[in-house]
């Protein structure tokens, strides 16, 4: 990826390699990068508004779009849209359990939560206690892992879905690729990843305060290729305030999506109307 980028302090970079050399060029710098990221979030209150950076009011629009995306995936990937299956999900960067409570636990019998900030995870335990959930006893938060993504290896073939939202920007490129390569082993046959993230218009934007990087769509696609992952489906998030970064949802699989017969597509098309942070 040769596109340049910008830091929140105004510093310009020719390409990601230049930025990563400066930020995580040796093990000491890399440790400092990750420690600063966790330290930033340790100073944030364990509420939905806190983990959403003061934008707690976007929660409803976020969950609504994510649910539509997930429903389409379940219908495409599993017989009977997964009903009758014992489905298991992993919520990465789970924070206070916002995505699990509002979405995942209504579709997956078990949800594991992965979060490096201990007071967020403790809040999630409370938020996801059985007495605080409006779901049957067959749906539950199963395991709570207080670990960062770069240190986590999932159990083999445990998950039908690994959901990663608003946290992958904390990983350096090499750890991004390593994480997904390990995590692929945690997917069941037919399983998939959902990555939901802020998107830079071009190149990347480095946030010096919380030590994270907002990548462009093309930057992500290059990393997906390095991970050996394929885009099954993607969709833009709608309904967020204009001042926020654009947000995309990517469904990623280890197998190449089947290509629709192009001649059939052409015949059908003739019958259609011609219609930041």
Task: Go through the PLM ranges and name each one.
Residues 167:
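Hydrophobic adenine-recognition pocket in adenosine-nucleotide-binding enzymes
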Residues 1-157, 171-182, 189-277:
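Class I (Rossmann-like) S-adenosyl-L-methionine-dependent methyltransferase catalytic domain
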Residues 163:
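A conserved beta-strand element that flanks and buttresses the S-adenosyl-L-methionine
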